[in-house]
Amino acid sequence: GMWYGKGPGVDRCGDVFRHANAAGTSKFGGVLAVAGDDHAARSSTVAHQTEHLFKAVMMPVLAPSGVQDYLDLGMHGWAMSRYSGCWVAFKAVADTIESSASVYIDPHRVNITQPDYALPPGGLNIRWPDDRLVQEERLLHHKLYAALAYARANRLNQLVIDSPNPRLGIITCGKSYLDVRQAFDDLGIDDKLAAEIGIRLYKVGMVWPLESEGVRHFAEG
């Protein structure tokens, strides 16, 4: 399934998200909640940002950087939702929604890797009957960690530029990743030069919960 709403819609649906995420998703289903974030309120009643609202209801949050990412991370979002039992949030900003690009549309180009996470007895998907406190325990102790395992196994967060002698590390996500790449181009810094002068660039696809192993590896050096 796919839910879509702008910032005010996310505000109004917080109760829905909390209950649905606690209940879970089907192992043959999955839900992607697409939030149309209009930071400058160009076509909205208020300026808004939604990541903190999804975090409050404990939904993993994906932040695609461009049109190609919308397709690729979208496929991963549904797969992660099926695997972890979580509803998965997907941040869609106005600047990207109103743009165009040439993209690869073959859905089979996205290879899904099953994590090695040890699932609890009964799995993580929706079931009935299901006590509300058991739902909360499953979400806090298993479902979010399963989402982290999925992100790690499928490299949703990537070290895009590495350097043998790193001096400066830049962590970025969403559209700001492309802004950083544009700034590099404006400065005449390609990937080879960035590595030579000691720059590391890390692109975060899942901004919450943040997968710590990849960040720790990035920060070493």
Question: Which stretches of residues belong to each language-model region?
Answer:
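Thiamine diphosphate
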Residues: G1-R82, V93
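Flexible, low-complexity linker and terminal segments
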Residues: P64-G221
